[in-house]
């Protein structure tokens, strides 16, 4: 089984380790209601998946990520819950710390908090937040979150000592430096394995530049809709419409066959990924069974 931590020599870190595969909740896809999200969470818990991930978007027909993961926490006990990613600078840091600590408590210590700055100007405008300086603000947030949790200034106290693991995303030099300074690992925004490999190498380099002990967690993501290519790709073109023509390139990366999924997973394994979260582009819970069969 691909998800069962098949060991390999990581190309970015030079050490032997395995990769787990998680799955996303369809919080942004058409047709997903509360019942659908709970069914996804239950099936993921029963299947071979290591985590449940969610996206974050303000001006879209999407479910708020902490609400979605709280619902998932209520019907699961095993899978890790991860934000892929929450747009940190859109949120008050104290409130964000409380939301994350609350979810960590409710889930029994299963939250991994991925944060990034986002690229959609309309989300910032909707909340009256200045997009300028958002990278600096995220860097401050990463440090402040740890301080808030460690000092127990805002309850509840997280189950995980020091708070949930923090992942930071982004592709600029400062984004990698920010990750190495204040996070526990790096979360990649998606794309083919070669793109992840390049980003992972930069994450490792930033980590080593600061002479941090241990190693960064490396998380990746991709999109899939097995047997449902047309609606899945249409969703991606809509979701990424703000990127213009690039949206069609993203849609072309939708994994719609078993062979495509296997090749994608293998590529991320070889690139040194620790956990790959496959995000659905259609909301049918039967997708989980199809994906589990492919990964078996």
Q: Language-model segments: what does each one mean?
A:
Residues 1-296:
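Active-site-adjacent structural elements that line small-molecule/cofactor binding pockets in enzymes
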């Amino acid at each position: 089984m691909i998800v069962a931590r098949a060991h390999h020599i990581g190309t970015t870190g030079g050490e032997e380790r395995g990769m787990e595969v998680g799955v996303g909740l369809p919080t942004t896809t058409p047709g997903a209601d509360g019942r659908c999200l709970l069914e996804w969470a239950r099936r993921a818990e029963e299947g071979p998946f290591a985590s449940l991930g969610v996206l974050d978007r303000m001006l879209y027909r999407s479910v708020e990520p902490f609400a979605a993961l709280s619902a998932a926490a209520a019907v699961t006990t095993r899978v890790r819950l991860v934000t892929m990613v929450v747009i940190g600078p859109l949120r008050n840091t104290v409130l964000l710390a409380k939301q994350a600590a609350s979810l960590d408590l409710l889930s029994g210590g299963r939250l991994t908090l991925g944060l990034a700055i986002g690229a959609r100007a309309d989300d910032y405008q909707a909340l009256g937040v200045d997009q300028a300086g958002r990278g600096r603000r995220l860097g401050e947030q990463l440090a402040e979150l740890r301080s808030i949790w460690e000092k127990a200034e805002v309850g509840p106290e997280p189950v995980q000592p020091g708070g949930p693991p923090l992942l930071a995303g982004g592709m600029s030099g400062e984004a990698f430096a920010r990750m190495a300074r204040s996070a526990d690992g790096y979360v990649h925004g998606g794309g083919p394995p070669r793109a992840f490999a390049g980003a992972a190498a930069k994450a490792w380099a930033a980590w080593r530049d600061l002479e941090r002990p241990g190693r960064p967690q490396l998380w990746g993501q991709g999109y899939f809709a097995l047997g449902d290519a047309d609606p899945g790709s249409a969703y991606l073109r809509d979701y990424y419409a703000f990127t213009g023509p690039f949206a069609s390139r993203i849609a072309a990366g939708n994994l719609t066959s078993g062979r495509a999924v296997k090749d994608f997973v293998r590529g991320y394994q070889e690139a040194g990924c620790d956990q790959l979260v496959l995000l659905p582009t259609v909301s049918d819970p039967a997708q989980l069974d199809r994906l589990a069969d492919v990964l078996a």
